[in-house]
Amino acid sequence: MHSRFIAVTLASLSLASQAVAWGCIGQDCNQAADQIAFSAPEPASYEGKVKSLAWEPTPGQGWQWSSCGTGDEVVNVESIVVSPDPPVPGQNLTVRAKGTVKDEVSDGTFADVIVKLGLIRLLARRFDVCEQARESNADLQCPLSAGEYELEHTVALPREIPPGKFNVHITGENQDGSNLLCLDLSIQFGFRR
């Protein structure tokens, strides 16, 4: 299931980067029906939780993530590893994730994803987690039992991703209304030569 959230995040990043590449930002993107409003936690809640996503512990390679939750969420992500790092527009990106699901995840579970380029909000969208898993023919399907999971997912990044720092914030709720997860990703795309 963690791979599904990362895949949803990367799909959102792909949509957002294409919107930027086509000069389409905000309400002009025909995303109005999908846009929702919610707030990110205060930066103080991130202290001590930032981890590098590089295959080797090399700072500044393009990715960072942090858990912005309280630890009581249904899904607790323990590690995320990406390759290549830094990510390269127009190439495949492989994401490996490891974590724990505390309670069953079933129909009615959703994830809210916000993608920003700097301070500009490119995308805010709610995803039905189980529906996304079915549509993408994911290895794990709902209902998902409590347990530990390690998953790998590869996504094609569009060539049109502009240079810049993308910030992705993911939250959600389980089918019973409990907090699903809280995850922040910072993704730096460099200048093409």
From Swiss-Prot:
The keyword Signal applies. Pfam families: E1_DerP2_DerF2 (PF02221). Residues 1-21 form the signal peptide. This is Phosphatidylglycerol/phosphatidylinositol transfer protein. Belongs to the NPC2 family. InterPro entries: GM2-AP_sf, Ig_E-set, ML_dom, ML_PG-PI_TP, NPC2-like. Residues 22-54 form a propeptide. GO terms for biological process: intracellular sterol transport; sterol transport. Keywords: Lipid transport, Signal, Transport. It comes from Mycosarcoma maydis (Corn smut fungus). GO terms for molecular function: sterol binding.
